[in-house]
């Protein structure tokens, strides 16, 4: 009877240890986004709703599942447990199929997702002219974004701020003369609105997510191969 290849066994262990670390990283990052002050300010208002956190909550679940699978894979490899390896294989295969399905749905409903982003941004415009405490947190987050990207307002420029425009002395102040400016209520403000910068920001991050997902899919396929080879070798001992 053939023995278990030490190379396959320890390659499987190393792979799953790295996989487990990836799970910790994803989980930690998602939790940080979920509880950070900036994300609370942007997504935490009642007007925006809790649906904005769905993607973050999914990442928390994915990170936890990857940690569990990494643990199963490590223990299965070291203990040469066919049961653990089979559970690892099934779990990893389900995650891979879910990633493929998500990618297909994302491509099919891309236009719809773009429309949802537009509607959300337009809906959030009214928060800039509101006076409540929860809206104030959102406003402060947008002010930081405006200063970084040298833009003003979300859709209609400085007019989006309504009466709040007078409450923030340096709001939208056009300090970079290389950027287009315009006069509003006796002040020179940035002419460009922030909606295009936000869309570009989301698009760039989406490309990063797609790249990470593709790399993760390759790693997952290797994990499936390693686990099945080791599973068969243990059965043939």
From Swiss-Prot:
Keyword terms of this UniProt record: Cell membrane, Glycoprotein, Membrane, Transmembrane, Transmembrane helix
CDD domains reported for this sequence: TM4SF3_like_LEL
Xref: PROSITE patterns: TM4_1
Pfam families assigned to the protein according to its UniProt record, in alphabetical order: Tetraspanin
Domain of life: Eukaryota
Tissue: Gastric, colon, rectal, and pancreatic carcinomas.
This protein's name: Tetraspanin-8
């Amino acid at each position: 009877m053939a023995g278990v290849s030490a190379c396959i066994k320890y390659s499987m262990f190393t792979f799953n240890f790295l996989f487990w670390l990836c799970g910790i990283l994803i989980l930690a990052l998602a939790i940080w986004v979920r509880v950070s002050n900036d994300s609370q300010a942007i997504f935490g208002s009642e007007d925006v709703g809790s649906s904005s956190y769905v993607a973050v909550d999914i990442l928390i679940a994915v990170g936890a599942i990857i940690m569990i699978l990494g643990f199963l894979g490590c223990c299965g490899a070291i203990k040469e447990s066919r049961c653990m390896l089979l559970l690892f294989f099934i779990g990893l295969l389900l995650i891979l199929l879910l990633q493929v399905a998500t990618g297909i749905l994302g491509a099919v409903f891309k236009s719809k997702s773009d429309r949802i982003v537009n509607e959300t941004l337009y809906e959030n415009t009214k928060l800039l002219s509101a006076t409540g405490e929860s809206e104030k947190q959102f406003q402060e987050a947008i002010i930081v974004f405006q200063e970084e990207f040298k833009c003003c307002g979300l859709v209609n420029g400085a007019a989006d701020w309504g009466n709040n425009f007078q409450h923030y002395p340096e709001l939208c102040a056009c300090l970079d003369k290389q950027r287009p400016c315009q006069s509003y209520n006796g002040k020179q403000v940035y002419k460009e609105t922030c909606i295009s910068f936000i869309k570009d920001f989301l698009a760039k991050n989406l490309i990063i997510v797609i790249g990470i997902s593709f790399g993760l899919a390759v790693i997952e396929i290797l994990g499936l191969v390693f686990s099945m080879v080791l599973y068969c070798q243990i059965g043939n001992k």
